[in-house]
UniProtKB/Swiss-Prot annotation:
Other facts noted in the record for this chain: The basic functional RuBisCO is composed of a large chain homodimer in a 'head-to-tail' conformation. In form I RuBisCO this homodimer is arranged in a barrel-like tetramer with the small subunits forming a tetrameric 'cap' on each end of the 'barrel'.
Biological role stated in the UniProt entry: RuBisCO catalyzes two reactions: the carboxylation of D-ribulose 1,5-bisphosphate, the primary event in carbon dioxide fixation, as well as the oxidative fragmentation of the pentose substrate. Both reactions occur simultaneously and in competition at the same active site. Although the small subunit is not catalytic it is essential for maximal activity.
Biological source species: Alvinoconcha hessleri symbiotic bacterium
The gene coding this protein: cbbS
Keywords: Calvin cycle, Carbon dioxide fixation
Protein name per UniProt: Ribulose bisphosphate carboxylase small subunit
InterPro entries: RuBisCO_ssu (IPR024681), RuBisCO_ssu_dom (IPR000894), RuBisCO_ssu_sf (IPR036385)
Quaternary structure and interacting proteins, as annotated: Heterohexadecamer of 8 large and 8 small subunits.
Keyword Repeat assigned: no
Length: 121
């Protein structure tokens, strides 16, 4: 049996913080984010955008940007809403969520824009 590798993290170390899906991978580029939105749409999930201050990123509740985009299938419209949220709140983390109506839960959630991370977080 192999040993379990410990994940060294610290709330006081900004470079060690991880956020949800894909946070252990290199940062997603524009095309990869587009692919994730296409996946959300292909699954029939309802996209939504949320944001919060970096110091509150580990709280359970983030601010919802408008309402979830029920039935939206236009990838460009979804990306435009995420970009609008980022422009309105440039110092906040912005995450994209895909709500699964059937399972009545989040199908996916990922931080797509990160606000500046300071040691006080």
């Amino acid at each position: 049996m192999s040993e379990i590798q410990d994940y060294n993290s610290s709330v006081s170390d900004p470079s060690s913080r991880k956020f949800e899906t894909f946070s252990y991978l290199p940062e997603l580029g524009v095309e990869k984010i587009r692919k994730q939105v296409e996946y959300i749409v292909s699954k029939g999930w309802n996209p939504a955008v949320e944001h919060t201050e970096p110091e509150n990123a580990f709280d359970h509740y983030w601010y919802m940007w408008k309402l979830p985009m029920f039935g939206e299938t236009d990838v460009d419209a979804i990306l435009a809403e995420a970009e609008a949220c980022h422009k309105a709140h440039p110092s906040h983390h912005v995450r994209l969520i895909g709500y699964d109506n059937y399972a009545q839960s989040q199908g996916t959630a990922m931080v797509i824009f990160r606000g500046p991370i300071s040691a006080k977080c």
